[in-house]
């Protein structure tokens, strides 16, 4: 029997063991508050049958917590509601559907029920989650402003906090919350954007500007989550992360991903694509239930031919655009123009979003950030410059 992990942090309900398909809410003294059973029907659908909340705990949000947690791993749920539970599921965003959307097993159960004429059964199905990507940071490792730099972009950011950029990282939120990378300033960024929980953690690579904030998650995991956090990346990146944060080796459920392998969570499919940057570096191709494909690659040199083939026609390309001009370019990054050229002409991307910016090696008196915005403007909205806090619907 597996352990049901991280169910009710926001309601302060700790974890509890239970059989596959059943999630339970347990309070202090091992008192059970409620349970939900998810059944996989012959037609391939996942069905709630049933949600049970014990009377003494009704009104505390136990049922809502059970259903919301179930949606993270079973985004397409079906059920038959009766009586007061009809309003409960409508409040959670479920929509009424036809009986043809319900597996015959459950339709037959209703047909045979002696209470059919009085209980008024109503078929429901969940609505696919709307996934939104939020940029926690959009700079290279130095940040903007860099403490040592007095270029026009950094000086402007000193005067105007809205121009500041933290190290690169993103959150994707649907029913669940997925964090990609833990930059050194991840705590401040999560607070700024209003995120208070994490369900999954992916690592692109183990350089400090993408890993340095991992320690900020320790007490969230130990005190709030009270169970291990799924931590996914290449075997090389995970090994380096645990070498640096060895005191957190009991905090994670490690998942070493092979090149081109996929993982599924919250209705998304996330594919790890190898990059030319450092050993074990990945970009992640994220496909949401609506078929939208987004490639997130904060650090990369020229894309591998195999990766190019996979990415052709990608809807949104969010990629390394570290340098504005060729000054300072080396073999592990892109310039802005390279990213735009690859995105539009090589991949045929619907939209290109520039990130991981480093405006510090500029000509005297030149604000490279301004010049990047001016350059992007000529593409009629097809090219955008990422900003801290910017949100993109996937």
Annotate each predicted stretch with a short phrase:
Residues 175-177, 182-232, 313-316:
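Active-site metal-binding motif and surrounding structural segment of the metallo-beta-lactamase
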Residues 130-189, 193, 281-298, 316:
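Conserved beta-strand hairpin/beta-sheet module of binuclear metal-dependent hydrolase folds
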Residues 224-281, 288-289, 386-388:
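Metallo-beta-lactamase
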């Amino acid at each position: 029997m597996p352990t049901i992990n991280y169910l009710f942090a926001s309601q302060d309900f700790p974890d509890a063991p239970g059989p596959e398909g059943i999630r339970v809410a347990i309070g202090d003294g091992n008192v059970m508050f409620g349970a939900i059973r998810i059944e996989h029907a012959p037609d391939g659908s996942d069905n709630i049958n049933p949600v049970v909340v014990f009377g003494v705990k009704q009104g505390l949000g136990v049922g809502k917590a059970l259903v919301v947690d179930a949606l993270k791993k079973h985004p397409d749920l079906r059920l038959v509601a009766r009586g007061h539970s009809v309003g409960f599921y409508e409040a959670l965003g479920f929509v009424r559907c036809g009986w043809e959307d319900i597996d015959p097993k459950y339709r037959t159960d209703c047909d045979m029920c002696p209470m059919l004429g009085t209980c008024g059964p109503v078929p429901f199905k969940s609505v696919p989650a709307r996934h939104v990507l939020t940029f926690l940071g959009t700079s290279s490792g130095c940040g903007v402003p860099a403490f040592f730099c007095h270029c026009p972009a950094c000086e402007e950011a000193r005067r105007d906090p809205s121009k500041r950029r933290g190290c690169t990282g993103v959150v994707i939120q649907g029913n669940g919350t997925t964090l990609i990378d833990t930059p050194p300033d991840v705590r401040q960024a999560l607070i700024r954007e209003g995120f208070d929980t994490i369900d999954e953690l992916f690592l692109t690579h183990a350089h400090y500007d993408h890993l340095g904030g991992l320690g900020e998650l320790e007490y969230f995991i130990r005190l709030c989550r009270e169970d291990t956090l799924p931590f996914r990346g290449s075997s090389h990146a995970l090994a380096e992360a645990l070498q640096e944060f060895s005191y957190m080796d009991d905090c994670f459920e490690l998942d070493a991903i092979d090149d081109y392998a996929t993982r599924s969570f919250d209705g998304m499919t996330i594919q790890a694509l190898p990059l030319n940057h450092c050993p074990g570096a990945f970009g992640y191709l994220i496909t949401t239930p609506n078929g939208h494909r987004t490639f997130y690659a904060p650090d990369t040199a020229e894309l591998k031919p195999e990766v190019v083939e996979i990415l052709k026609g990608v809807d949104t390309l969010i990629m390394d655009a570290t340098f504005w001009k060729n000054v300072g370019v080396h073999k592990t990054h892109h310039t802005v123009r390279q990213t735009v050229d690859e995105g539009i002409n090589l991949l045929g991307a619907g939209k290109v979003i520039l990130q991981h910016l480093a405006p510090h090696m500029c000509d005297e008196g030149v604000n490279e950030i301004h010049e990047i915005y001016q350059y992007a403007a000529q593409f009629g909205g097809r090219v955008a410059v990422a900003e801290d806090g910017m949100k993109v619907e996937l």
